Each structure stands twice: as structure tokens, then as C-alpha cells.
A protein has these predicted regions:
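Extended catalytic-interface subdomain
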Residues: 301-311
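A post-motif C-terminal structural segment
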Residues: 294-302
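Cleft-lining beta-strand/loop regions that shape enzyme active-site pockets
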Residues: 22-39, 46-48, 54-59, 63-69, ...
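Conserved functional hotspot residues or short segments at active or partner-binding sites
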Residues: 1, 311-312
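Catalytic palm active-site di-aspartate
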Residues: 76
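Long, charge-dense accessory insertions within large macromolecular proteins
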Residues: 2-35
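Conserved catalytic motifs of ABC-family nucleotide-binding domains
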Residues: 73
């Protein structure tokens, strides 16, 4: 029922704007997890074959591992939220099963597991914090003859706005740059290929690491009100040779960052002849009554709504 409702609303929003989407509550949580790099789950990776959704690996120290009841190749038959009626996940895609397993910190999820010998059992687990560090910025040093080149991969312009100590891509990029400077690299490559964008605030902060100070991007509302977002902090973290790698899937914040580096003549932008071409800004608008103290989870999810356009 929820899936049909979500599909119905998105069929309407897509007629008006390709970047406006309705998120059902579980999809809203998934979007927040992607942006923050943090979720609450059981510490297991899933896979799928003809037998259904299976356990591919168990993270040492995680809830599944600590239970001692879940092992690789166990098939997940049903998933229940606490004492609620279990959902039969036979025929589910792995991504849909994952959304049911994840939830709020400290809450209970019950998995009906089928063992390789055909026996079934219900395993009760308490969700714990999991960090998606593979989605964070990371760096490497490339040896080019007698010279060292620094390489930084940024998959998304992620930001955890719900937790003060949460992950921020601009802070992580600064840490990686400091590591590369300590290695005495001759230049740095920042790879935003396949980076679909993310936080507008973070891209301004990140561009400020490579310029002294100044405007980064202008945003404009439907009423025509313009606002310039600038790096207000004097000083440059890294002033050496810089290359930004893009491709046709580099969108939104990636395009803002590459454009700022180009406009300030701080580095070269290399890759495809054009990037994705997304020039709009979205915000999440919650639907329904809050389901938690912070209002992060709401009764009917949220709409990611286009509010503004951005300009170089």
C-alpha cells in the first residue's frame, strides 16, 4: 500500500519537476542515512539469489555477530518491527529488505531466518549505530616517477545535520588534504566523477579550502530573490597544483565545486566534455506529525522539493 502511494505521488511530481520526489517514511530514513553516512542496523551485509535475500557477511562486533545466531548463507524469510506483524520478504529486492531491517537506534527488529538445513528460527536483534565509511572521502598517494601526486575520492557531498559531531565532507576533505601535504605531494587530484551532489552548505565550505575567500555560488528563488553564498574565512588550506575530475554524472554540488575552482583559476577541471547539468536546489519538507523528539521521522515521510536555482 505504501509503495503504491509513493509511486502515485511521484508520478505526479515527475510531471512538474524531475528533481522533486516524495519519500515514504522508510525512504526518507534511507535518504537521511545516505546524506549522513550513518544508520542504525544489525551489522550484516545482504545478497540475493534464487533462494531469496541471504546473509553475505556479518560484521564483527555488530548485533548480528553478537547474537551468535546469524551466519553467512542464512536466508531471511520475514522481518518484523518489534512486536508488529512480520513482513514476508520472499521475492523482495535486497535494497527493500535492507530498508525494513534498518530503523531507529535501540529499537527491536525480528528476523525469521531459514538455515541451510531447512530449519527456521526467529532472531531478535537491537539496532546499533553503523558508519558507512566507504561513502566518505578517502585519499591515496600515487607515485609518478620521483614525484608524489595526491588523490582524493569524494563519492557525495555528505553532511550529518542531525548530530553536531556527525560526518561532514568538508571536514573530511580537510583532513585528507593535511595527510597529503604531510606526504609532500606535488599536486592533488579531487575526483568527483559519479558524485551526484548533496549539501549546498558543504560545497561552499569545501571550495573555501582552496580559495582565499569570496563568492562561490548564487541561488535564486522563484520570486527572483537572489542570495550569494560565499566563503567568508580568509586563508587557504592548500594552494598547490589542483585538478578536479568530472564526468557526465557529476551533478549539482559537484558542478558548483568544479565551477568555483575554474572561476578562481585555482586548478584544472578535466574529464568529460560536460557534466550532468543540474542547476536546482532541493529541500526536504516533512509530511504529517513528528514520530520522534527531533522531528526527523514523520508520519507520512517527506517531499524533496525544488526551491531554488543556482548560478555561477
Amino acid at each position: 500500500k505504501e509503495k503504491r502511494f509513493e509511486s502515485f505521488l511521484n508520478s505526479i511530481t515527475s510531471l512538474m519537476d524531475p528533481h522533486t520526489d516524495y519519500f515514504a517514511p522508510v525512504e526518507k530514513r534511507s535518504f537521511t542515512e545516505q546524506m549522513s553516512g550513518t544508520f542504525y542496523g544489525i551489522g550484516a551485509q545482504l545478497t540475493q539469489d534464487d533462494n531469496g535475500v541471504k546473509i553475505a557477511s556479518v560484521q564483527p562486533g555488530g548485533a548480528a555477530w553478537k547474537s551468535g545466531l546469524i551466519v553467512v548463507n542464512d536466508v531471511i524469510v520475514k522481518i518484523a518491527q518489534g512486536a508488529e506483524e512480520p513482513v514476508d520478504v520472499t521475492g523482495y529486492e535486497t535494497t527493500d529488505a535492507v530498508k525494513l531491517i534498518r530503523g531507529d537506534l535501540g529499537t527491536e527488529v525480528r528476523l525469521t531466518i531459514r538455515k541451510p538445513d531447512g530449519t527456521t528460527k526467529v532472531v531478535v536483534l537491537i539496532r546499533e549505530k553503523i558508519v558507512l565509511d566507504e561513502g566518505f572521502a578517502r585519499s591515496a598517494v600515487i607515485q609518478n616517477g620521483n614525484e608524489k601526486i595526491g588523490y582524493i575520492l569524494l563519492p557525495d557531498f555528505y553532511a550529518d545535520f542531525e548530530r553536531e559531531e556527525g560526518a561532514r565532507c568538508s571536514k573530511d576533505i580537510a583532513k585528507e588534504v593535511e595527510k597529503l601535504k604531510a606526504e609532500k605531494v606535488k599536486g592533488i587530484i579531487i575526483d568527483v566523477r559519479y558524485n551526484g551532489g548533496g549539501s549546498l552548505y558543504e560545497v561552499v565550505q569545501m571550495a573555501g579550502l582552496f580559495i582565499d575567500k569570496g563568492p562561490i555560488v548564487q541561488i535564486r528563488s522563484k520570486e527572483g530573490r537572489a542570495q550569494t553564498l560565499s566563503d567568508e574565512t580568509p586563508g587557504i588550506l592548500y594552494d598547490g597544483p589542483l585538478v578536479v575530475m568530472v564526468n557526465e554524472f557529476s551533478a549539482s554540488a559537484s558542478e558548483i565545486f568544479a565551477g568555483a575552482i575554474q572561476d578562481y583559476k585555482r586548478g584544472l577541471v578535466v574529464g568529460s566534455t560536460s557534466s550532468y547539468g543540474k542547476g536546482t536546489v532541493q529541500r526536504n519538507v516533512a509530511f504529517g506529525k513528528p514520530l520522534d523528539a527531533m522531528g526527523i521521522q514523520t508520519e507520512y515521510g517527506a517531499v524533496k522539493l525544488t526551491f531554488q536555482k543556482f548560478y555561477r
